């Protein structure tokens, strides 16, 4: 059992709550704002202390690159933890892995499925329906990297701020969702990319799913 200070416990709980509510960890700036720190640097110092104690892992260069680790207390939550595929003894779900998606066909069409993974249900904030192979770095600062496997639950509607898989005409993309009236913005988590704006009155758009977890295979 790792011994944490009261402040470290507070930050760890904040990370867990953010992961549970939104599917992803908070940024340093969000931690600082929530806990009344003067700067994101103060949050970074506490995160580094948590990492040294083995409570979290930090991915350098990403604002949301925080992963929860097993602290030996049975409270190991996901998403936010990126990990290797689990031991066969823990496998409970069989999830299709979707690769490239052809225009005009359902995302779970047989020709899109590259493989099937058996994974532990407890790894996800909600039961996923499929895994999507991430392509590109537009969601880098949310800790979602090229080649990662995004666990996705099929949905018809989403809340502002959630990370979704959306279909825009012939393209499928992973972005943060924001809707106002008939206008939708699909927001990247990388300043090198521009938001995608959708007018439901004119543009072809569909929600394919909600991100509920993230897996990374280690070689």
From Swiss-Prot:
The keyword Transcription regulation is annotated on this UniProt entry: yes
Species, as recorded: Janthinobacterium sp. (strain Marseille) (Minibacterium massiliensis)
Catalysed reactions, semicolon-separated: Hydrolysis of Ala-|-Gly bond in repressor LexA
Family affiliation: Belongs to the peptidase S24 family.
Site (Cleavage): 103-104
DNA-binding region: 28-48
Gene Ontology process terms (BP): DNA repair; DNA replication; negative regulation of DNA-templated transcription; proteolysis; SOS response
Complexes and interactors: Homodimer.
Keyword DNA damage set for record: yes
Its job: Represses a number of genes involved in the response to DNA damage (SOS response), including recA and lexA. In the presence of single-stranded DNA, RecA interacts with LexA causing an autocatalytic cleavage which disrupts the DNA-binding part of LexA, leading to derepression of the SOS regulon and eventually DNA repair.
Listed GO MF terms: DNA binding; serine-type endopeptidase activity
Name of the top EC class for this enzyme: hydrolase
Enzyme Commission number, as recorded: 3.4.21.88
Protein name: LexA repressor
Keywords of this entry: Autocatalytic cleavage, DNA damage, DNA repair, DNA replication, DNA-binding, Hydrolase, Repressor, SOS response, Transcription, Transcription regulation
Active site positions, chain numbering: 138 (for autocatalytic cleavage activity), 175 (for autocatalytic cleavage activity)
């Amino acid at each position: 059992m790792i011994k944490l200070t009261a402040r470290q416990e507070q930050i760890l709980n904040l990370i867990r709550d953010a992961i549970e509510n939104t599917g992803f960890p908070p940024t340093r700036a969000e931690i600082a704002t929530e806990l009344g720190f003067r700067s994101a640097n103060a949050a970074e110092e506490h995160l580094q202390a948590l990492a040294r104690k083995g409570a979290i892992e930090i991915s350098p260069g990403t604002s949301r690159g925080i992963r929860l680790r097993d602290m030996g207390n049975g409270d190991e939550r996901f998403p936010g933890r990126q990990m290797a595929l689990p031991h066969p003894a823990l496998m409970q779900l069989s999830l299709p892995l979707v690769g490239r998606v052809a225009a005009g066909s359902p995302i779970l069409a047989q020709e899109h499925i590259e493989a099937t993974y058996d994974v532990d249900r407890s790894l996800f904030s909600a039961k996923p329906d499929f895994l999507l192979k991430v392509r590109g770095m537009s969601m880098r600062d949310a800790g979602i990297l090229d080649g990662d496997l995004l666990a996705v639950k099929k949905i018809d509607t989403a809340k502002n701020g959630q990370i979704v898989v959306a279909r825009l005409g012939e393209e499928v993309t992973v972005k943060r969702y924001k809707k106002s009236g008939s206008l939708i913005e699909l927001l990247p988590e990388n300043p090198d990319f521009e938001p995608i704006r959708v007018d439901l009155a004119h543009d072809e758009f569909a929600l394919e799913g909600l991100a509920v977890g993230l897996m990374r295979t280690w070689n």
